Each structure stands twice: as structure tokens, then as C-alpha cells.
């Protein structure tokens, strides 16, 4: 019996040859833990300013397309375009995105940075789509989490309840949020978050439930349908003129016509 590395070729051999094969145990036993990964890699983005972190989140999709065109290197880190097997220490775009979100949430502990994040993130399309009110630090932290990989971030200490409550909200309100279940399974995402919490033996005690209820109260006060109304108000003066041409009396607020 021979032990080999887990590669595409060795898998083919496993399935097609009669000889006994085993994969090297170190490859089987090394499990990915984002909490550990986060502690080991946060320094890689320490030079990023708060504004730069927010710019990354606002332009996430465009940045992802560029990064995934080829191997992308920054500092000592390389995100590979293709990889037969992603290792526990390898950087990926999703892991980088999660690192930046964790970094930003931590920055909300500083009042000056909190105010900066609050003012800048309000213009992000996803925050407007959720109709999320930005009234305090907790609501700003929720804003930072929107669009992030909740199963990854849930493994980081103190991020458990914000992750699970947001996952529940997305599952409950996926239609209002315009989430296509074929592209993003909210129930599956919630299950992954809970699996992460269970694996770290996280206990939802009274204090944690209280924290969760605070996040839930903020989310329940959001209005996912407000984005269109906000945009309409922006053009209300001009749009009302056209309404008048169709015989509709001009109103103080365009939304009152609905």
C-alpha cells in the first residue's frame, strides 16, 4: 500500500487502478478555520485605511472580476486564478473580503472611524437596497456585514450572533430583498452558520440572545422596498411634472401617489 498526495491524477488512479492507495494524512486532517486564518492574516491588510476598506466593499463585484482574471499578488499574498485544491492557508477572494469586513467592524470601536464608516457606507447600493437605518454602532456593523460570507465570519469570536441573526433575516426576507434562491440559498447559508457555531461549541446564553435581539430589532426596522422610493424622491420635482401631464395633481411627496 502506498501513500500519495491528493491530486487530480491520484484521484483518477484511486478510481481506475487495482492497487491500494491512501492519501497523505496531513492533507486530510488540516481543516480550514477562518478564525485562525483571520488571526494569521489580518496584518496583511493593516496598511489599508478605513476609506480604502469601504472602497473595496462598494466596488466588490468589479474588484472580484479583475482579481479572478489571473493570479493576483499583493504584498506576499497571491490569490490563484485556478487551484486544484484550496489549502487552509491559501488566500481566496472570499477570505480576503471577509478579512476586510472583520477589520472594519473592529474599527467601529473608534468613534472617529465609526462616524467615517457611517457616513460613507450609507451610499453603498446594498445598504440602500436593504433600507437599513444607520443610527448606531450596531447598525453600522450590520451594514458592513451585508454581502459578506456569514459562515466564514461567524467563526470569529464576537461575530456569532450578528452572523446568525443576519442569516435568519435574509432567509425570512429573501423575496423582499430580491435574493434569487437559485443563486444564493439563504436556508443553506443559515445552516452553514449554525454548523460553524456548533463546531466551536458556541452557547446561545441569555447575554448572547439579548445581543441577537438588538440586531434583530435593527433589521426589523429596515425597509427593503425603500430603495425605489428614495430614488424617486431624488427626481421628484421633475417626475411630478410628468405626472401632471397625465392629469395627476402634483403632490408634496411623490411617494404619496402610491
UniProtKB/Swiss-Prot annotation:
Domain remarks in the Swiss-Prot or TrEMBL record: The N-terminus and C-terminus are involved in homooligomerization and play an essential role in viral RNA synthesis.
Pfam family, one: Tospo_nucleocap
Keyword Nucleotide-binding: no
Protein name: Nucleoprotein
Record keyword Ribonucleoprotein present: yes
UniProt GO molecular function: RNA binding
UniProt record similarity statement: Belongs to the tospovirus nucleocapsid protein family.
Places the protein is found: Virion
Gene: N
Subunit structure: Homotrimer. Binds the viral genomic RNA.
Domain of life: Viruses
Location, primary (coarse class): virion
Keywords recorded for this protein, A-Z: Capsid protein, Helical capsid protein, Ribonucleoprotein, RNA-binding, Viral nucleoprotein, Virion
GO cellular-component term (any): helical viral capsid
Function: Encapsidates the genome protecting it from nucleases. The encapsidated genomic RNA is termed the nucleocapsid (NC) and serves as template for transcription and replication. The NC have a helical organization.
